[in-house]
Regions:
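Active-site gating/metal-coordination segments in enzymes
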Residues: 54, 64-160, 201
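Mid-to-C-terminal alpha-helical segments outside catalytic/metal-binding sites
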Residues: 1-54, 227-232, 244-289
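Active-site environment of divalent metal-dependent phosphoester hydrolases
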Residues: 12-17, 62-65, 93-97, 121, ...
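Alpha-helical scaffolding within the catalytic cores
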Residues: 37-45, 69-75, 98-101, 163-165, ...
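Short aromatic-enriched loop/helix-cap "lid" or pocket-rim segments at secondary-structure transitions
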Residues: 16-23, 68-70, 101, 156-158, ...
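Conserved, mostly hydrophobic/aromatic
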Residues: 10, 74, 114, 137, ...
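Hydrophobic/aromatic residues located in beta-strands of well-ordered beta-sheets
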Residues: 6, 55, 85-87, 144, ...
Length: 289
């Protein structure tokens, strides 16, 4: 694969405000101090993503906090640009029929990975009741992306989102490709420790560039532990964009604090990392050619 490609592993599909409870929308606006438009429009994404070649997208299911995106919405979104979009299904394993939803999303809708939101839905990813999920992902080579780190939602239990829980999962299901979102912030040290020890566990840098000091510190941990190769590019659209994320990441190469700095070539390698190969996903353009 061309090493100049950019693959965004973390974008959302919210085709309307219907998936959100009023409380969820209010808390999202409170976190930004201003009302936020949560609706994703693919034309808006592409307008700020001219250099992005492939994009992974997903909805989200978390009954606890009032978020529920039907997987059909994601499948329909992918149809807008099947040569560049890869859709993941979402699951809330605290709710009935999640196993049937998993099989339907994968086998009938053609979605190619799984998105989990442990903190938003209120479950531990290593709970043995989720073993059928991890076995299915391992059997069918479905990568699993989990929200890790903090949230603006008051009802989201932080203890369910710690990166250490993925260590347990990866020891039991070592062949599953796992992505921990947001570098597990503010628990980046734990996240780095976990991606370092497990060959198929990765992290993305989505939604971090607007906290530049924190991201600089996080990537210094990545640098010192030698795990640049385990970190993937992602945005968290619609909360930010490809262009803003690229600018934010590249600006960190200009920062020097005492004797500490981040190598520009490592940041560029992160931006152009072949996430599809690492996650075992086919290029959608080749699949539809």
């Amino acid at each position: 694969m061309d090493n100049t490609m950019i693959i965004d592993v973390h974008t959302h599909v919210f085709t309307s405000n219907r998936p959100f409870s009023a409380t969820f929308l209010a808390e999202a606006s409170r976190a930004r101090s201003t009302p936020i438009d949560m609706i994703t429009r693919y034309a808006d994404y592409r307008a700020t993503a001219a250099n992005c070649d492939v994009t992974i997208c997903f909805g989200g299911k978390a009954h606890l906090v009032g978020l529920w995106v039907d997987d059909q919405d994601v499948a329909d979104y992918v149809k807008q640009d099947p040569a560049r979009l890869i859709g993941f299904l979402s699951l809330d394993p605290t709710q009935p029929n999640w196993q049937a939803e998993m099989e339907y999303g994968h086998q009938e809708l053609g979605l190619q990975g799984i998105k989990l939101m442990p903190m938003y839905a209120g479950f531990l990813p290593q709970d043995q009741q989720l073993d059928p999920l991890w076995r299915y992902a391992q059997q069918h080579n479905l990568p699993v992306l989990l929200h890790t780190g903090t949230t603006f939602v008051a009802q989201g239990p932080i203890e369910t989102t710690l990166p250490r829980h993925i260590d347990v999962v990866a020891r039991r299901f070592p062949e599953v490709r796992i992505i921990m979102a947001h570098l597990g912030h503010p628990f980046e040290g734990e996240c780095v420790a976990v991606i370092r020890k497990h060959p198929h566990v990765y992290a993305d840098v989505s939604a971090l560039h607007y906290r530049p000091w924190q991201l600089f510190h996080s990537l210094m941990l990545v640098h010192e532990y030698g795990v640049w190769n385990k970190v993937l590019f992602g945005t968290d659209f619609p909360f930010t964009t490809v262009d803003a994320s690229l600018t934010g990441l590249r600006s960190l190469a200009e920062v020097k604090i005492d004797r500490f700095s981040l190598p520009a070539e490592k940041i560029e390698a992160l931006i152009h990392r072949n996430a599809l190969e690492l996650l075992g996903l086919p290029h959608p353009g080749k699949a539809t050619a």
